[in-house]
Amino acid sequence: RYKVRTRTYVDSDLCFLEVKTNGSREATVKDRLRYRPDDADRLTPEGRDFVVERLVESETCAQEEARTGAGALAPVMDTTYRRTTLHLPADGARATFDTALTWEMLDSDGVRTNRRVLVDRRVVVETKNPSTASPTDRLLWARGHRPTNLSKYATGMAVLHEHLPTNKWHRTITRRLDACRHDRPARRGV
C-alpha cells in the first residue's frame, strides 16, 4: 500500500511531491521531492520517476508494477485547510490544528468540478508524540475529547462520492462532520 500526493504550503510558496509507504513495524515512511507549485495538480515525468524509485526502493512494488501504478495515477481531489502547529520541546511532541477543511472533487485532468464540501466549526487536532501521551493529549482527554480515526483523503472521497463505501469512516462522517458540513459548488477560477 502507498499514497502519493502533492502538498503546497501557501504562505511560503513551497510545494512537495510526497510518497508514503509502509516501513518496518507498520511505521509510515514519507519521502519528499521539491516540486513546482504550478505542477501541484499533475504528475510530471520527473515526479513519476520519483514515485517509481520510491516504490521500488521501499520494496512496495517491483519495477514494472511501480511503473504501471505511477502511470495510472490521476488527480481526484483537492484538500485544503488552515493549519497551526504547536511544538512541545520538553517532550518532543507536536500538535496540529486544522480548520476550514474543504474537499473539492477534481476531474482526471486536475480541473475542479462542481462538487465541493466545506467542514465548518470543527478543528481537526492531531497529536504527534515520540512515545507516550503528551500534555496536549491529556488536556484533550480531560475535556472529554477522545481520539477518532480520520483519514482526510478517505473521508473526503467518501463525502464527495456517494457511491463509495463509507464503512470505516461512517461514524466520523455522521457523528463528527455532518452537523458542520456544507456542500457547495466549487470555486471557479481557482
Pin down the residues of each PLM region.
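Phosphate-end processing signature that detects enzymes handling 5′-triphosphorylated RNA
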Residues: 1-190
